[in-house]
């Protein structure tokens, strides 16, 4: 259900939204960035609710909010309210929906945490593979606002299914006393202690950057297809391949981290992004774009498991909700920065291809920082 608040879904409507509200690339990017930034701030507080509320109670509230947000997008006639619409979608969809799933699985599964996170993220991957093609096809038949009404209906239908599936859910309180997993130095770290540790800050550029520029790429998918001279449908037709690679990478990374831990994997998981964005920058054929999607999928799949397991493995599970809420807020902030930055740079005349060269350089630097941070903390990490 988080798909309705994800960039890959919202950005499909970018052309229609810009036309309806008479927005430039920079205007739309700024509005999207502002709404996403506000949701990042809200996540710092709301994310901690997973430490005190059961998913069975919190989940339906979030899904109801997501359904209302979809209706808000469908019926909002004023550009002044568009940042509020984006905030609601991003907070309830990208923010809380994914956060609840990741924290629940990270807390409930210790020995098989990687596999559990892989399974939890299959829903996201399925949505990423199917919704873009479906929505582009539906937009040929219906007005775009009607598709958002359909999204709201789907979100409402998912509420009773969630309640039924979690009818015997374990509570955060029971997990705090029975199945704790400690972090570095054999202890449970609080949010403030985590923020004071250098490892957190060595990892942040990579986590924020991946969110920022992956979001920016899908946010500008319509513009990207235009400058390459491709039909938009040709581009979204590659999404299932991207998603298939991401699913394979997600499962493989989940299995590997259960066997060897995150420390040996996480410094290298963004290396494919370097070459993906170089292909997007310089490639002019659909084949080059397809190879770029394959490389992008390798990192996106690993992102579904490695960062979530990283927080639990290094800082323990007792305060995982609040710790991951902070990290999630930072990543949501990144997803606000990416579209806003690329949109403004486009308005100032910097071509998207040139921006993607800079993005590839960024991922090289962030991978180096991760390697340094993990190497410094290795002796403190539980085995």
Task: State what each model feature region is.
Residues 10-14, 192-250:
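Extracytoplasmic gate region of multi-pass secondary transporters
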Residues 57-71, 264-278:
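Structural signature of the two symmetry-related core transmembrane helices
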Residues 87-122, 316:
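Cytoplasmic helix-loop-helix junction between adjacent transmembrane helices
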Residues 124-170:
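Helix-loop-helix hairpin linking two adjacent transmembrane segments in secondary transporters
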Residues 128, 317-349:
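A late C-terminal transmembrane helix in Major Facilitator Superfamily
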